[in-house]
Amino acid sequence: REDKLDGLSIEARDEVIAAARDLERKLEQDPLSLYFPHEKGRIFHGFTTRVKMASGGTQSGKTTMTQADNLIQALSEADLPSHLRPYKKFQPPFLCRIMGPSFGVLQNVIYQKLQELVPPHTLAGGRWSAAFDKQTQTLHFANGSKFFFLTYEMDLSKMGGFSGDRVSYDEEPPLGHRNEGRFRVMARGGDEVFAQTPVEGLTWSFDGLWTPNTAEEFQGQ
């Protein structure tokens, strides 16, 4: 608000207003360039193992970290800000299956977060509405990368026919869905990314991920 600039000189006021407008333009045109991960986020993005996890409570930033990481892998290197390029592991076309507990979570959390972060010019057609196929729940990027969205409510028998670079889970999936996802990235030497709040106590993820983990296979933050 400009009334908060009262007391500044005309020159200083103009500089602040110009900087604010420049920030607004950048937020609209290239929001990912304004994503600067905190220390734990930098550690998470730097993991290169076949399984990695961002675990934390509500508002801890785990969804932001995982979806930003998905975008880092999906975009062409030229479209990434320089401070995020060191975290790029895959080259386009990057094929990623993103899963959540329900379509409500996909629509209200995942889609919203991706729209906040993705530079519109990197999407097919230059905007979300053109790039997102509602019928197939697929997001298309201009460089050929794709995000395929499914939920844990979907029957396992309908999860076939996909071979990709990554499966990204928002909240802990049922074990059967995780096993299916793990199988789907094997052919392309892909990875799995988890973002979850440990609210159910010691579940399969403790026995299946934490307990037997090795530095070569799993890293969590």
Regions picked out by a protein language model, each given a short descriptive name:
Residues 1-221:
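Phosphate/NTP-binding elements of NTP-utilizing enzymes
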